[in-house]
Structure formats: C-alpha cells, structure tokens
Amino acid sequence: HNLLGKIIVKDDVYQLRSVVSQQIADPQVNAILMTGGTGFTARDNTPKAISPLFDVDIVGFGELFRQLSFEEIQSSTIQSRAFAGLANGTIVFCVPGSPGACETAWDRIIAEQLSSEHKPCNFVDKLLVDKNS
C-alpha cells in the first residue's frame, strides 16, 4: 500500500463531502480511511457527509467493527457509527478517531480486506476498476 496523502478537514458536511468527492474521482486513489466524526455530537458529521456518495454500502463493516469493539470497550461501542462503502471504485472506511478504534479497524478488518492474499474474499478486485471509463 502507498499513502498518497493526509488531509485534515473541518467537521463541516460540505467540506468533508467536497474533499472525499475529489479523492474518489482521482484514479490513483483506491481506498480512503477517514477517522473521527462518527459519534453522536453535533460535530460528528461524517456519516451525513459521506454516505450519500456511496454506490454500495458495506453494511458488514460497521457491524463487524462494533462487534470487535465490544470486546474492548463493552457497550460503549453502540455510540460508534463506523461505516464503509464503495464510491466510484474507491473503498471508503469511516472509523472513530480514537487511537484504539483506528487500531482495531486497521488491524482486525481493513488490512486483511485490502490484501489480495486474504481468503476466501477481499476488496482488492473491487478496487481494480478503471475510473476513466
């Protein structure tokens, strides 16, 4: 995997949506990992901003993330609105901003699903689309 960049965006629905829209249109970007903004405060705008961009929701991501998080933070996991989806051939993962949540998401879900060696299935073939066609 190659990191193409890091972008910090204010918790504003339209700024978040604009930045992610630009990234999913970029043929070099295959995956986006967003952290923060998935809770229940007035500033947690990531779901509202990003969900409308998805062609396909990956419902199982949020479900599995909360199941794994339950092992670590018990019932507090219900406050997470972690989610993922495919948009223009780019997979977008949105996870809570805490270091523990980011580690859980990467180590126990995302890294495996972005590896072509993970069986029986992974997201790699979903990402190998020509965005220019």
Residues of each region from the PLM?
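Non-catalytic beta/alpha edge segments that cap or flank active sites
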Residues: 1-133
